[in-house]
Design a protein with these regions (language model features):
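Short, low-complexity intrinsically disordered segments enriched in A/P/G/S/L with frequent Arg
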Residues: 23-28
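N-terminal Rossmann-like dinucleotide-binding module
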Residues: 35-78, 82
Length: 271
């Protein structure tokens, strides 16, 4: 359908139509049924895929997200096995064939669009994305960085923060743009550096926060709570706020054969 948070309003006085089962059931007066389509994402990775696994695990716990494609920049990345175990289609790009970054991104865009991905989620992806991808998914390419941007950019952020002796570091989720590690920030979570922390224990703490924060942000996006203004600043509406309600109220045609919906009931006055 291409729309998120689509609402099916059912105006029967005493019954509603169960969109999943095609069966009628008692329906309290003045109640409306909301059908929310899952957010379809493509995940890019280069390594073990622990953040991919965290997302997969949270979808089993009700996160309204569907991973429709995984693309790896390395054929030996363990994240490929995680995707296959979850039944997710996987592509591994051959660096010899796609040595040119723009050619690689053009192929990635083709595969993600064919899979129906609405957002691109970088999860330990070690290649910089090009304008080819950014233009195909404007403000829809997410990146996870293991530090509080704009501090400690680059591939060794945790080690750099530890070496600098900071007392607080953290995790940032941001939209990617053409400036490396500098796109609009969606969310940040601080991590305190304890006196007895080693680099290894700090890495463990950072990764634990990553695995919680990334799915949470995806849940915000799926609920229609995230927007980017003209100045490039990200705003997250309160849960159930106006932005989320407007998104949920967007009318659409619901095809029950797709089977990718989260059902919620909202009590209110039918108009």
């Amino acid at each position: 359908m291409g729309l998120l948070g689509c609402r099916l309003r059912v105006y029967w006085l005493q019954t509603y139509w169960d969109a999943r089962r095609g069966a009628r059931a008692p329906h309290p007066p003045n109640e409306r049924l909301t059908v929310t389509e899952k957010l379809k994402i493509g995940v890019l990775l280069s390594g073990s895929g622990t953040n991919l696994q965290a997302i997969i695990d949270q979808t089993a716990n009700g996160l309204a997200v569907e991973v429709v494609k995984v693309i790896s920049s390395r054929p030996d990345a363990y994240g490929i096995e995680r995707a296959r175990a979850a039944g997710i289609p996987v592509t591994s790009l051959n660096r010899a064939v796609y040595a040119d970054p723009e050619a690689a991104d053009a192929q990635i865009v083709t595969e993600l669009q064919a899979a129906g991905a609405q957002y691109v989620v970088m999860a330990g992806y070690m290649r910089k994305v090009t304008p080819v991808m950014l233009n195909a998914f404007p403000n829809r390419v997410l990146n996870l960085h293991p530090a509080l941007l704009p501090s400690f950019k680059g591939a060794h952020a945790i080690a750099d923060a530890f070496a600098a002796g900071v007392k607080v570091t953290g995790v940032t989720v941001h939209f990617a743009n053409e400036d490396y590690d500098k796109g609009p920030i969606v969310a940040q979570e601080p991590v305190r550096v304890a006196e007895d922390d080693t680099l290894e224990t700090l890495e463990t703490h950072i990764h634990q926060v990553e695995h919680e924060l990334y799915p949470r942000v995806l849940g915000w996006i799926a609920a229609g709570r995230v927007s980017v203004d003209d100045a490039g600043h990200v705003h997250v509406a309160p849960e159930g706020g106006a932005a989320a309600q407007d998104k949920a109220a967007s009318a659409c045609t619901v095809g029950t054969h797709q089977g990718h919906y989260t059902l919620r009931r909202h009590v209110g006055t039918l108009r």
